[in-house]
């Protein structure tokens, strides 16, 4: 069947997106480029199969091979993270978080999570999210001077608010997080500790960031981002919580699992168990540090916290005449993809923001090294300082094209 002739409108859009990915420098910290094997598994005949339940306990017949696939994903994830319990069925990180809350607390209970402006995620208690609608939510931020987590202040808030669950983890925080300090605070107030490691899961898998598994009561993650798998979620915990977590995923929050996506997760987990994966993650860190140094050394830009310990950074734009949305659009115009991001003590709306978030997982997958990343950072600075100079912007486009031609997506 010729799909392009059967549905040209759809396939034209897909082809244009493929070209965009090929010719743009992708710096969105939550995006990556999966292997052909991951894509093939996700596009397999497993998409045809319903499989409500869990391996060995399905509500439908004909699941014997589906069980093998899902068990492979579970076993590989357990091996990667040294986890007693793994659930690979969550459709997304948000679904994993919803299930984790449902397993440990009840509607109306209190969540203590990281404030959005400090780098937290919507599902950590933001009022516009289910986590701030079905539950009471309070937040902690970062120290205004250092822009880093202040564990004494988090403890003070926890003692005052007495939450039922404390959420550690972030979507835009560039420093190591001390899981043990969060554990101590949670124990002191009698709260469960939940860690959302969606952004850093690949670094944790490679042993390059401290692991929360075995410290937190429950750990959630996405399977894309640094883990370089398909878009999806996962929950890790202790065996003693298996029954309540399984129930919270199915039937409480989801129906049939996406077994074609779970197969792709199994592929990605297999890749993460290979020595090359650690080499890749080390380069992700080197590239991020190289970019952060360029931005921090510039006269009008500032990297929140002054640098990075992981794959991302938030660049503070308050020293420029542009906001985050304007810089995002400006960089889109020169084929560099970023996203607007709030900074600590943010004064602008979430639709404008005072910063941009930058990450290195996708460009590292393409093969970029430190010098390439320094060049990209300098191109970004040049674009910001020449936002109205079409001649300079055209030169930047040509330089971007040279880099993407040098490192094509396989």
UniProtKB/Swiss-Prot annotation:
The modification N6-(pyridoxal phosphate)lysine is found at residue 225. InterPro entries: PyrdxlP-dep_Trfase, PyrdxlP-dep_Trfase_major, PyrdxlP-dep_Trfase_small, Ser_HO-MeTrfase, Ser_HO-MeTrfase-like, Ser_HO-MeTrfase_PLP_BS, SHMT-like_dom. GO terms for biological process: glycine biosynthetic process from serine; tetrahydrofolate interconversion. Pathway: One-carbon metabolism; tetrahydrofolate interconversion; Amino-acid biosynthesis; glycine biosynthesis; glycine from L-serine: step 1/1. It is found in: Cytoplasm. The keyword Cytoplasm applies. It catalyses: (6R)-5,10-methylene-5,6,7,8-tetrahydrofolate + glycine + H2O = (6S)-5,6,7,8-tetrahydrofolate + L-serine. Its cofactor is pyridoxal 5'-phosphate. GO terms for molecular function: glycine hydroxymethyltransferase activity; pyridoxal phosphate binding. Its EC number is 2.1.2.1. (6S)-5,6,7,8-tetrahydrofolate binds at residues 116, 120-122, 349-351. Keywords: Amino-acid biosynthesis, Cytoplasm, One-carbon metabolism, Pyridoxal phosphate, Transferase. The record marks 224 as: Plays an important role in substrate specificity. Homodimer. NCBIfam families: PRK00011.1. Catalyzes the reversible interconversion of serine and glycine with tetrahydrofolate (THF) serving as the one-carbon carrier. This reaction serves as the major source of one-carbon groups required for the biosynthesis of purines, thymidylate, methionine, and other important biomolecules. Also exhibits THF-independent aldolase activity toward beta-hydroxyamino acids, producing glycine and aldehydes, via a retro-aldol mechanism. Belongs to the SHMT family. This is Serine hydroxymethyltransferase. The lineage of its organism: Bacteria, Bacillati, Bacillota, Bacilli, Lactobacillales.
